[in-house]
């Protein structure tokens, strides 16, 4: 049975339809999740504030956000201007097939840690776990249909968890500057959100905001 012959009522067809739905609407879902997180920070304060756990979470959070930002910029150098017309298999894409999403997870967990709330971090991690496997499957299907060499690339390269022994760089690489510049904004938004998260904490400490709930 070919892909085009799979009926929407077939289990594989239903799974593909769900994958496509989550892929199309992931930005909207993230907006809802981020709104929930910001509301939690507006009305809640961490139970760990003032304990040794607080600076630990903040440090881990800053590390995660920093790695995510640098990693996304590294990916953007390789993928900018090539996303739909070239199968990029070197640099970060030699380590795994979806390094951008690895960076997203690092940034999401980093932001969660910076809220100093394990509950908020768990919500962010759950949202990622529910959506991004579907996004990865959808993108893999597109790449398989667009590039005959993808099958060999997928055979040797893990989808998500990087394998450092596979790293292969380039001595020279042409960067699509205009496309890379557009991708810079997409790569640094974790930094912007981290500033917002810390601002809520500062406002609570200064008494500008009053917490009505304690965040675990």
Swiss-Prot record:
TM ranges: 27-47, 50-70, 116-136
One cellular component (GO) term of this entry: plasma membrane
Sample GO molecular function, one term: transferase activity
Subcellular compartments: Cell inner membrane
Top-rank taxon: Bacteria
Principal cellular location given in the protein's record: membrane
GO biological process terms on file: response to cadmium ion
Keyword Phosphoprotein: no
Membrane association type: Multi-pass membrane protein
Function summary: Component of the CZC cation-efflux system that confers resistance to cobalt, zinc and cadmium.
Name of the protein in its database record: Cobalt-zinc-cadmium resistance protein CzcN
Organism of provenance: Cupriavidus metallidurans (strain ATCC 43123 / DSM 2839 / NBRC 102507 / CH34)
Taxonomic lineage from the root: Bacteria, Pseudomonadati, Pseudomonadota, Betaproteobacteria, Burkholderiales
């Amino acid at each position: 049975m070919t892909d085009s012959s799979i009926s929407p009522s077939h289990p594989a067809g239903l799974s593909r339809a769900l994958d496509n739905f989550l892929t199309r609407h992931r930005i909207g879902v993230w907006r809802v999740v981020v709104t929930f997180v910001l509301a939690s920070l507006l009305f809640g304060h961490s139970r760990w504030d003032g304990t040794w756990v607080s600076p630990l979470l903040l440090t881990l959070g800053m590390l995660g956000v920093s790695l995510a930002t640098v990693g996304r910029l590294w990916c953007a150098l390789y993928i900018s201007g090539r996303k739909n017309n070239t199968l990029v298999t070197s640099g970060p894409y030699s380590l795994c097939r979806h390094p951008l999403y690895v960076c997203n997870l690092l940034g999401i967990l980093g932001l969660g840690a910076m809220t100093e709330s394990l509950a908020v971090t768990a919500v962010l991690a759950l949202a990622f776990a529910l959506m991004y496997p579907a996004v990865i499957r959808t993108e893999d299907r597109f790449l398989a249909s667009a590039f005959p060499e993808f099958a060999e690339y997928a055979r040797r390269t893990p989808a998500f968890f990087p394998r450092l022994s596979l790293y292969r760089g380039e001595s020279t690489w042409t960067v699509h500057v205009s496309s890379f510049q557009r991708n810079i904004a997409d790569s640094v938004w974790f930094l912007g959100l981290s500033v917002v998260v810390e601002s809520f904490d500062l406002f609570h400490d200064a008494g500008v905001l009053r917490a009505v709930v304690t965040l675990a």
